[in-house]
Amino acid sequence: MSKSLYEYDFPKDLKKMTFDELDLLSYQIRDFLIEKVSKTGGHLAPNLGVVELTLALHFTFDSPKDKLIWDVGHQSYVHKILTGRAKGFDSLRQFGGMSGFPKVCESPHDVFDTGHSSTAISLSMGMAVSRDLKHDDYNIVAIIGDGAMTGGLAFEGLNNISESGRRVIVILNDNGMSISPNVGGLAKHLRNLRTSNQYLNIKKTAKKVVDVPYIGDSLYKGMRNAKDHMKYALLPKGILFEELGLTYLGPVDGHNVEELVNAMQAAKKINGPVLIHAITKKGKGYRSAENNPDKFHGIGSFNPCTGLPNPSKGVSYSSIAGDEILSMAKDHDDVVAVSAAMCDATGLRKFADKYPERFFDVGIAEAHGVTFSAGMAASGLRPVVAIYSSFLQRAYDQIIEDVCIQKLPVIFAIDRAGVVGADGETHHGNFDIAYLSTMPNMTVFTPNGEKQLREAFRIAYGLKSPCAIRYPRGECPLDNNAVAEPNCISENTVIDLTKYATERSFSGQDVDIWAVGRMQEKAKEIRIILEEKGMSVGIVNVKMVKPIDLSEFDDKAKIIVTLEDGTLNGGFGEQFSSKLYTQRIDRDRFENNQTSLISKDEYNNKVITIGWPDKFIEHGDVKNLEKKYSLDAESIAANIEKRYNELNLDR
């Protein structure tokens, strides 16, 4: 009877195994992944596709002395199993449990905290410089793929490595996918390489030659020189990576451990940058994931027997946003949609199917996607760019330089805004309010629920200027009238944003809560708690954080609370407070030298700003994270009541 994965002493035991034993282990690992991820959710399909690749890595290299750098990091589950962390999978991505990404604090085998795409090659170059300057001797391996090679940063790194000539091994995990299928010229080039039998046969021969005693290395170098002269005849389009200065090994079967080990051993003998091109299948070994790799890229809990996800509670913000963008496209021929390799995840699949000529997937290239959209906007189109909040950070410069400065009508549909949970620090979207609100010409919508979300898109189309619409992950509160309302916004509509930005839903003399976006729902919970304690509580729904509208400001309220699902530093609360100090209005009760809405002393006493603290928030269920950081309704209500009592206010 074979051992369970918990009984192995990994990675030590791995190096004692035969190739046949490693093949058997690959089946065991896949069964383990399916069982565990079906309960916790996670990145299943990418990890099923790298089982043999990861086995070969830990069989060939000596981690942690040799540095294994996982690009993005979502494909590191097998790596975690093979470095002694199998028991951690019961708490994978759970509050207080094991991260779904490499974490330096978790294991010495995790050499860098990754989470975003296309960084591993640049990281490997930096580590190679450090190694060489210190005269150390170890291998540095960057594992990149699952679409990450479509990112420009990856090619900046390749360019730098090829120029330096430093000893770095890049392993390209080519599964033809990112989240959606790979797009662009690079994807076509890789497909050509996969089908080049002539080149593959030469490489197989070369790998055999390396193993010839005493003379193998010399013969291999000679074959490399001969290959340089032959490749143009064999492959008219050339080998892109060879032209960039890397020795190219492959394509190799990414599900054959022996082939992979042979390629890696050959790469270790080359004194310079090497790229191993491994062909893998995303979702390998689990039919549901093989047939629907995009659905199983990142998935919640599911039934492992049927492959069907566990029932969701409702309709997501992403789905409603996608429907509204499609509705805009039906009404306006100039509307186009742009995705960064996340068509399904951002709700754009219906749009792509209905209007394929108006849908553009730019790959994992957010910066390019924004400037590409700016070009379309400058030429008369109305692009809607649907990107996760965390990933939009990668295009910060392009938003300012190419969109806002020229006041171009690009609509940013910012999905997964706020703290999103299980994927942790690298995937939370809690900085967008702070950085987008500082950009001149930018309008920022923060809708809560279906009605406000649909309205935001309709108003944004009519503004003819840069607009950002941020909305959270998960279930969207529905409104039966939201779809039925006519689309009254046209290119000639004039919108008075100051009359739309805020909306009072409740009035109260004791506490006034200004709630941004999804926090409007939490404000209702807080109101119930405080009113049971005898307080009168008002709520202002903040549907836009730029411009900030103070028309609903009630200076008679004893306590004013701002509530946002974003970082406090530079967030709505700080900007709201600043405007209270500086806004100049005419009111009879103010003298000429007292023109602010609120004095500094009053502010210190009565204004409470609530949001996420100045730190990177870890992974875990959102409710648990809110509880830890006192952002749950009960903790916020207690905080307000404490301030109220400290001021000796009457109820």
Where are these regions (language model features)?
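Extended, hydrophobic alpha-helical segments in both membrane/secreted and soluble proteins
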Residues: 140, 144-149, 153-157, 347, ...
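Helix-enriched interaction subdomains in cytosolic or periplasmic regions
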Residues: 301-303, 437-482
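N-terminal amphipathic, basic-rich helices that act as targeting or association modules
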Residues: 2-81, 240-246, 251-257, 277-280
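Cofactor-binding active-site loop characterized by glycine-rich and histidine/acidic residues
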Residues: 43-164, 334-335, 340, 348-349
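Short beta->alpha connector loops at strand-helix junctions that form conserved
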Residues: 362-363, 387-388, 446-449, 563-565
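Short alpha-helical segments and helix-capping/turn motifs at coil-helix boundaries
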Residues: 38, 50-59, 123-128, 152-159, ...
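Glycine-rich, histidine-containing beta strand-loop boundary motifs that form or position
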Residues: 48, 70-72, 144-145, 172-174, ...
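Thiamine diphosphate
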Residues: 91-123, 133-137, 163-295, 308-353, ...
